[in-house]
Structures are given as structure tokens and as C-alpha cells.
Amino acid sequence: MDAGVRSTVKFRTTSIALIFGIAVCATFSLAAQKKPAATPVPVVFAQDKGRLTIKLGGQTVGHEEFEIAPSGGGWLAKGVAEIKPPDGGSSKVSGSLTLQPDGAPISYDWSAQAEKTNGAHILFANGVASITLQMQGARPFQQDLTFNTPLIAVLDNNLYHQYAVLARIYDWSKRGVQSFPVIIPQELTPGTITVQSTGSASADGKTYEGLKVTTSDLEILLLLDGNHRLMRLEVPDAKVSVIRD
């Protein structure tokens, strides 16, 4: 499979009001005192669902169906991509990422079907990603990757909706350059990315909000609508374009 399609990244992060202290006054009346409510965890996500067309050198090589939705007390971002490059065999990859409302990952499962079927389950806790990898015909392999923060970006091969998740994790109130640790699960690769708002950007006669993602060897441009939904993704050096249908 062409390297540009195989991976766009190669190197590879209730409010409970406390009522306490019942005070007894001289006449034995009771008064409940209430502490200020704890600051609620911010919710950075919005429900989204769509289909992406994946192009390499202007030629369609695959599609991805995805959905980002509330799940329990958190959020679930899941997608399935089918890739068939002109000079290689077809493959199918799926990913399911469970997240805290603030964007920190809780767990991730992926499965890739090509000549063999491989997959993994990852649990995130206290900045540690505990990975159990299952390769067809091999014993399960376990590995831990340690990060210095629980807010880790998960950007897996050929699952471009995960850049929509990244666009939500980016702090738009601060803007500027923001760095995130990142994990590429199918490659067991950790690394660091920087994300920066580029302001207004245009493509095919349409205007978007631009967000630039920089890795050690690639620049990825995310084009978002006014609600920061991913509409288009461009990787110029790899000649990859991903366009929402």
C-alpha cells in the first residue's frame, strides 16, 4: 500500500454540590451550609456522523464511515475505513475510541483486515497506555507506553475521523501553537505533534477554518466548518486528500 495512504503520521496523549456543616444556633435551629460547586469537567465534543472519501493523487482509493457520539458518561468516536489503492491489495480497518468529556482517551480498540487480521486493545490511565496486541497466528503481545499527561491524541492509520477528534481537543479559546503527545496504535509508536490555527482557508471555492497539524516529517491541514467539524483534510507531501461527502 502506498505510504501516503498507509499512514499520514510515521513517528510516531458532576458537579457535586457539597452540603456540609450543619450549624446549631442558640434556639436549636439548623442551617445547612453549601460549598461552592466544583468546576464541572468541560465537554469539548459535539455529536457528528459522516462519510469521508479518501483520495491519493486525485484518485479515489477508499471511504470511511464514522460517528462521534455520547456514550455513558463520556464519548465514543468510531470509524470503519475500506482502502483499495491502485497498486496494492484492499484492506479494512476499524477503530473505536472511548474518551472523557475533556478529550482524554479511556480505551481504544482497532482491527485491521488485509492478508491477515490483526488488532489491539489499549487502556489509558494516569498517562500510561497499556497495549495488548493480537497478531494473527501469534501470541498476544503486551507493551506499556508512558506519557506525561492523560490528554493524549490517538491518530491511527487510515482512520481520518480521529483528526476530527483532535480538532475538538485543540483549545480554540487560546489558539496559537499547542503541543500534544500522540500515539499511532497500529505502529505502537508514540510521538509529539503541534497544532495551530491558521485562520481562514479555502478549497474548491469554499471557505473554512484552517488547523495545521505538524509532525516530525509531515504537515497536515484540517479544514473545518464554523462549528469546527472536519470537512476536509490535506497532506500535500503525501498527495492525500480526505473529503467529507
What annotation goes with each model-predicted range?
Residues 213-214, 220-237:
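Short, exposed beta-strand-loop hairpins at the edges of beta-sheets
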Residues 17-27:
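Bacterial N-terminal signal peptides
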Residues 40-47, 61, 114-209, 234:
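Solvent-exposed helix/loop surface patches that form functional interfaces
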